[in-house]
Amino acid sequence: MTIFDNYEVWFVIGSQHLYGSETLRQVTQHAEHVVKALNTEAKLPCKLVLKPLGTSPDEITAICRDASYDDRCAGLVVWLHTFSPAKMWINGLSILNKPLLQFHTQFNAALPWDSIDMDFMNLNQTAHGGREFGFIGARMRQQHAVVTGHWQDKHAHARIGSWMRQAVSRQDTRHLKVCRFGDNMREVAVTDGDKVAAQIKFGFSVNTWAVGDLVQVVNAVSDGDINALVDEYESHYTLTPATQIHGDKRQNVLEAARIELGMKRFLEQGGFHAFTTTFEDLHGLKQLPGLAVQRLMQQGYGFAGEGDWKTAALLRIMKVMSGGLPGGTSFMEDYTYHFEKGNDLVLGSHMLEVCPSIAVEEKPILDVQHLGIGGKDAPARLIFNTQTGPAIVASLIDLGDRYRLLVNCIDTVKTPHDLPKLPVANALWKAQPDLTIASEAWILAGGAHHTVFSHALDLNDMRQFAEMHDIEITVIDNDTRLPAFKDALRWNEVYYGFKR
């Protein structure tokens, strides 16, 4: 069972009684056929549920009201099969609090050139019925998604599926609880922010729990549970000699397993799906959680280091959005550069916490090595290189009056040399359009040093996310030019200032 099994999307047909009962019967028949086909053939992440026709203001308002209060409903897909006067939709749309997608399609793909008559024209009016619906959305300043294409078109299927993922993610975010073990890293600016504003805008809550509360749960873990988890480690990873059963770091592995089990129990008991740690607040823990965090991220939890709750929440959101898709999604940090003319590279990593979902195919290495930061015992961690190919890094920042999402499109490349002395997982990439423009644009826009890295999602996914949550998005890709980028930042300042 996946998170998408907990939700459904309602399929709503807009029409009116003007055309008579026979036309409405055909509309219903077409709708039933389309919904059945989409559910069986389109590989959508969650189920479409056909609702009764919306042919009057009261019917439409009732559907929108019910959708708003049904926890299983992630959003509405609306098809204007015939002309549906848009004033009928005003009350319903004014109370709808779920995402809305307008599927601009029609039942037939080709025109029946020899037999087309006015009955056919009246029945198949998406071409102008959809425009009427679009006007009322624009008039009410209600942004919604639009997908145009025949209902049998695979590209349309993919776009609807992508939107569904966003809709489900939005609903999940409304219930998301972020646990901060300790506070932010001292004196760091970008990881701080307005948690009340975040809950108002996105829905997720952020609260702090003392590390001592976690330590109590960690210390209560039984040796039997620890040994069972270490057996799992041995089947999934390549253990270095020091971490094997008679190795001198074996106890560190056992302690890492204890921390993982305790941390997961704490998160489950509290209903948390994202969390942060900080190396400055580890009182009672014997090592900085590394292996535990990596494995919890792989299970779908959001995480960020140094108390960075915005990135932790964004990682959870993107994990939900990408559920079931090929490729992984991880916490990441731009760590250091390789300057070489024509081949500038970014080496991304963190102290320990990179998600194995982005790893290359072979087994990760489980090792224990010294970590100078934090002042604790040497922590266990998984070491691996990352899959190659197109990816994105995304950052969510708090500008005081609004949130800005930054997205840089990147190309992950194979590490050209072994890294025998680097004891952490890492990713190597080329930033688009190049390192100079990408880094300068990122800095000018205020992007954080922490990001969410993803092979599974792309720029279109993040644009949809920004639109669905009504936040600013700043894009750095192969089309980026710094003068235009700076102008866009200035224009956005005016636009969002006006919106206040």
From Swiss-Prot:
It comes from Citrobacter koseri (strain ATCC BAA-895 / CDC 4225-83 / SGSC4696). GO terms for biological process: L-arabinose catabolic process to xylulose 5-phosphate. Mn(2+) binds at E306, E333, H350, H450. Coiled coil: none annotated. Its EC number is 5.3.1.4. It is an enzyme of class 5 (isomerase). Homohexamer. One of its GO terms (cellular component) is cytosol. The gene is araA. This is L-arabinose isomerase. Its cofactor is Mn(2+). Catalyzes the conversion of L-arabinose to L-ribulose.
